[in-house]
């Protein structure tokens, strides 16, 4: 069986969690497919596509249109589409739907319906339209959690299977041998800072977290923010100033290499995920796997992934978040318990397991003997 995986998101200026998903799924599919299978990557036309190279995956092959014309074309129909494949998997709603070849579409969240205020009006319209097309024209829709599945069933009429396939933790996030040196180079002390990792956009709740740091009971620890700016003009220095915090209390590092992220996770007092809305919340899983206590909002997807192994506070509640951070930072036994439970919970997820389930789905959709 020949599977064409769309890797255009990997080349986006802000790949985000969906870009990591595409890379990890591609690599895991290539590693688990077995004899008679082939995975190839496909992108829009770019002069350079080296950023979308995934070990074990063919290509990436370039379609004949640049990104913007390709988006416009796929809003209307299935062409141009990957050639010489039996099935196409689109890891975002941008997909060549409507042709004869089966197309699987991953939908990462239901935010366009549940929290439209956290997207641009144009983004809401586009995602609703493309996810709606997937619901009616895809061979299957894949979602990362039961929470997303429930919302899609509530808001859409699905004419195809809706399949929940969890995510995993990148092997590149293994704690490096020079973790202490990497932390020191950033001016950080192991166990002496809080960490949050997310694309900087309104729904990630960074305003809530910064406000919580100024609240009663919050630990007197610096906050390290890892992630690229997204939409919405999230101005971290302005948030810090508005909260009355010293300028150095919050440090923004932007996007960092995986080795640095692993080192940052390994030294954090806690990983904080205060999102207003998520579909999976990959940082929660990454934190638990790294042996870091995790504090999240009570967004349904985050609670589902945490599986009772995180500290949960109400979405948007700065007072509760401040108190929770204070408890975690001040209670060594609680931290040990969270680490133990988190590692156990994280072991339930893997990219290998996700890829195995996806191959099962592909074989259900492609006629026997194809490829």
Locations of the language-model features?
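Carbohydrate transferase catalytic cores enriched for Leloir-type hexosyltransferases
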Residues: 1-371
């Amino acid at each position: 069986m020949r599977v064409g995986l769309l890797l255009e998101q990997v080349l986006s200026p802000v790949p985000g969690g969906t870009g990591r998903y595409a890379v990890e799924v591609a690599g895991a599919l290539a590693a688990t497919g077995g004899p008679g299978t082939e995975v190839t990557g496909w992108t829009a036309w770019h002069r350079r596509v080296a950023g979308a190279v995934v070990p074990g995956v063919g290509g990436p092959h370039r379609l004949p249109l640049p990104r913007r014309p390709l988006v416009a074309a796929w809003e209307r129909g299935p062409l141009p589409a990957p050639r010489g494949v039996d099935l196409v998997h689109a890891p975002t709603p941008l997909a060549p739907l409507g042709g004869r070849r089966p197309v699987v579409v991953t939908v990462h969240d239901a935010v366009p319906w549940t929290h439209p205020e956290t997207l641009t009006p144009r983004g809401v319209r586009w995602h609703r339209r493309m996810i709606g097309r997937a619901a009616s024209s895809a061979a299957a829709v894949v979602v990362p959690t039961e929470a997303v599945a429930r919302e899609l069933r509530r808001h859409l009429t699905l004419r195809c299977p809706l399949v929940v396939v969890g995510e995993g933790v990148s092997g590149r996030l293994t704690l490096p041998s020079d973790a202490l040196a990497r932390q020191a180079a950033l001016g950080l002390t192991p166990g002496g800072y809080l960490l949050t990792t997310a694309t900087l956009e309104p729904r990630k709740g960074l305003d809530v977290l910064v406000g919580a740091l100024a609240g009663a009971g919050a630990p007197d620890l610096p906050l390290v923010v890892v992630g690229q700016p997204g939409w919405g003009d999230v101005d971290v220095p302005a948030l810090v100033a508005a909260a009355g915090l010293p300028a150095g209390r919050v440090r923004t590092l932007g996007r960092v290499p995986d080795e640095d992220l692993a080192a940052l996770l390994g030294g954090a007092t806690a990983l904080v995920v205060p999102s207003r809305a998520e579909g999976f919340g990959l940082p929660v899983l990454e934190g638990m796997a790294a042996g870091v206590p995790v504090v999240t909002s009570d967004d349904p997807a985050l609670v589902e992934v945490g599986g009772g192994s995180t500290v949960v506070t109400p979405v948007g509640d700065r007072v509760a978040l401040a108190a929770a951070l204070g408890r975690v930072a001040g209670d060594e036994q609680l931290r040990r318990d969270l680490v133990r439970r988190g590692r156990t919970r994280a072991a339930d997820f893997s990219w290998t397991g996700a890829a195995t389930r996806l191959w099962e789905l592909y074989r259900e959709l492609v006629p026997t003997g194809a490829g």
